[in-house]
């Protein structure tokens, strides 16, 4: 079992890094904005695989995709995924990874604004350190523009909204992560495919202000091969994520996610040969210091919550067993 978990972690890490690099190549050699087209291709590919799976072993969760909570989750997912690809299109890989790290402190801020859920005071210094480091890197990026920074900010907000909505839907409908994906995928595929031409036409005007990419791949067949490879990698990443979430603690999964961020950051710096100034290095170091600090602080709380939850479940099972015996 342990060897299977390690294999899943390795496969997820390799494919997660590979898909970012492949997507960047697809964007650089498309000649036009294709962020939403890429997202639609991923969803259509995964929906086709899901359709074949449902044909052989139907799932009850698949028939609940028109539930109001499922529709809301699908809309959130349809907004989040194209914007994530658009952010990768308009930013360097390293800058995009720094923007993703901002989701950690921004989640606490947005939860406080909309739900009045204030973070623990002892977590605030680590979150501020993460924000300062990420902003230092973003604002020191010579290739950054107002449009690219704005898209990064929108990506963070939409990712938070997507996570919040999907978590609420999963709680209300009492579904696993895999069942949630089955619910979200049909309508998300429809929404993204229908809106992809419009979104890409708008993003084309924005990306015109960003750096112009020189084509590396000349043959259209080669470009479509990379597009297909991206879809395959996306399917593997999605599947391994669900498997890992079910077999790892939340903290371990967050550590894995941030480890992938560091790997992509290092690779991304050398991807386009863009020079990185000292201030950016300091910003990156500050960001990851804040992340590690946060994870060390949140570890005791995570363990305690898990223990409390386990004790509550045990008490409920014990009470149920006593009731059955008395009857």
Where are these regions (language model features)?
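Polytopic endomembrane small-metabolite transporters, centered on the Drug/Metabolite Transporter
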Residues: 1-327
């Amino acid at each position: 079992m342990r060897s299977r978990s390690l294999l899943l972690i390795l496969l997820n890490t390799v494919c997660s890094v590979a898909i970012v690099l492949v997507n960047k190549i697809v964007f650089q050699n498309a000649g036009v904005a294709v962020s939403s087209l890429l997202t639609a291709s991923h969803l259509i590919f995964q929906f086709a695989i899901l359709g074949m799976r449902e044909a052989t072993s139907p799932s009850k969760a698949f028939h609940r995709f028109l539930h109001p909570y499922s529709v809301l989750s699908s809309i959130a997912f349809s907004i989040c995924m194209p914007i994530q690809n658009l952010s990768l299109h308009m930013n360097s890989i390293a800058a995009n990874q720094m923007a993703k790290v901002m989701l950690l402190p921004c989640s606490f801020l947005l939860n406080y604004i909309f739900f009045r859920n204030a973070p623990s005071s002892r977590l605030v210094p680590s979150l501020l350190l993460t924000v300062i480091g990420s902003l230092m890197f973003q604002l020191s990026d010579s290739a950054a523009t107002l449009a690219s920074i704005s898209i990064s900010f929108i990506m963070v907000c939409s990712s938070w909204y997507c996570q919040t909505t999907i978590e609420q839907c999963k709680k209300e409908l009492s579904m696993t992560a895999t069942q949630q994906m089955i619910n979200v995928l049909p309508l998300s595929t429809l929404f993204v495919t229908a809106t992809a031409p419009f979104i890409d036409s708008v993003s084309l005007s924005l990306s015109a202000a960003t750096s112009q990419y020189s084509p590396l791949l000349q043959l259209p067949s080669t470009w479509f091969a990379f597009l297909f490879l991206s879809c395959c990698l996306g399917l593997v990443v999605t599947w391994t994520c669900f498997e890992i979430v079910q077999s790892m603690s939340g903290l371990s999964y967050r550590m894995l996610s941030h480890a992938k961020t560091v790997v992509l950051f290092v690779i991304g710096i050398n991807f386009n040969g863009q020079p990185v100034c000292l201030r950016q290095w300091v910003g990156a170091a500050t960001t990851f210091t804040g992340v590690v600090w946060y994870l060390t602080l949140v570890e005791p709380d995570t363990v305690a919550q898990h223990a409390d939850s386990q004790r509550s479940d045990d008490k409920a099972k014990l009470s149920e067993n006593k009731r059955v015996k008395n009857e």
